[in-house]
Amino acid sequence: MAQRAVWLISHEPGTPLCGTVRFSRRYPTVEKRARVFNGASYVPIPEDGPFLKALLFELRLLDDDKDFVESRDSCSRINKTSIYGLLIGGEELWPVVAFLKNDIIYACVPLVEQTLSPRPPLISVSGVSQGFEFLFGIQDFLYSGQKNDSELNTKLSQLPDLLLQACPFGTLLDANLKNSLDNTNFASVTQPQKQPAWKTGTYKGKPQVSISITEKVKSMQYDKQGIADTWQVVGTVTCKCDLEGIMPNVTISLNLPTNGSPLQDILVHPCVTSLDSAILTSSSIDAMDDSAFSGPYKFPLTPPLESFNLCYYTSQVPVPPILGFYQLKEEEVQLRITINLKLHESVKNNFEFCEAHIPFYNRGPITHLEYKTSFGQLEVFREKSLLIWIIGQKFPKSMEISLSGTVTFGAKSHEKQPFDPICIGETAYLKLHFRILDYTLTGCYADQHSVQVFASGKPKISAYRKLISSDYYIWNSKAPAPVTYGSLLL
């Protein structure tokens, strides 16, 4: 696993090139290995100028890039991985790992230890995951405590020396560049106990452990025969351990009720020291997989000082929390809408907020509205062609609510009115936004009494959980709609 080159590019809309290479590093020894491994399919690393132009074009970040380009924008080229192929001088440079964050484009080219023709599957290219870890480490270093451009420039000037230690000869040794900074500025001091690479100091103060479980539920609902509704839960467990000592040991347990949905596809933080194999083998890829493990999920770890994501997981819950249908029909100069939403009986009926956003794309401003709602309030944003149905904090006892009415629009202004290439004609959706505190759809919770801490002092244990909607769509059942098959992608 190694990297052939790395770039940091500032995105500057309005300038002639739309960007500037702030930092770049090439690794000639890795490039020689790439030439051997790739053989006839080898494509050399280009100069900064051609690379900058090709990358901005592929990311659609050029100011004059408004037209549809078949090779980049067709449905066969939908990119969901932040991994690209760049056409440079008639040849394609692949794989290029790149993403935009805080107006900085982070990019690198991992070494592929095999021929590139035919293109190997990404899962077989181990340098890709290391490339992401490398770029995320640089991002964390640049923006940890960074307050202004001068501090950013200072950190950019430190990168050449830091990468000599963190990534010598293109091989990543430590993604935490702060460790390399400490080694550069201070002489090494022999310590009685070695600290892990992700921990840069010790804590002094009142001991406490905080555990927060956040589940995001996605859904695409159609209310159509022959098209299956899809939904998926993605969970994140975030921890903050304020404990004295160089390497305090902690064991955190996640539990499920008897009717809970098993956790799958679990990814853990590097500070986890060991793990039951049953936790790692539970996968959502195979629908016939019977390896579901219902817990308890124990994570022994040596926590870092800062807040960290202990693990991520998915879960295949039996039903979405809110089921509904949306019907929109065009009648002469107005639209007739009918909406019905039903909260599942197993879901906690206590929201921090719950709203249904009903946008009308590719139309003029709302000039007239007549409606009837069984529950909640309706807000109208006329210029934005948007209705927001404020449901509030609870559904009624029936768990079912409805909204119906007619909407009339004025003349469309191309400059102000919202445009969407999918929502043409009667193709439309409503999007649900909600949050429920002290609740998870899987039932997953952190048992405060089962948290084991091997450190001085008795810590205060706090546990929180919440469910949040994410990409929760209900499409008009009277018109065509984009369809997702199988499980929703992360």
From Swiss-Prot:
One of its GO terms (cellular component) is lysosome. The keyword Cytoplasm applies. It holds the Pfam family Adap_comp_sub. Residues 206-476 form the MHD domain. GO terms for biological process: endosomal transport; protein transport. The keyword Transport applies. It comes from the Eukaryota. InterPro entries: AP2_Mu_C_sf, AP5M1, MHD. It is a peripheral membrane protein. Keywords: Cytoplasm, Endosome, Lysosome, Membrane, Protein transport, Transport. As part of AP-5, a probable fifth adaptor protein complex it may be involved in endosomal transport. Probably part of the adaptor protein complex 5 (AP-5) a tetramer composed of AP5B1, AP5M1, AP5S1 and AP5Z1. Belongs to the adaptor complexes medium subunit family. This is AP-5 complex subunit mu-1. It comes from Macaca fascicularis (Crab-eating macaque).
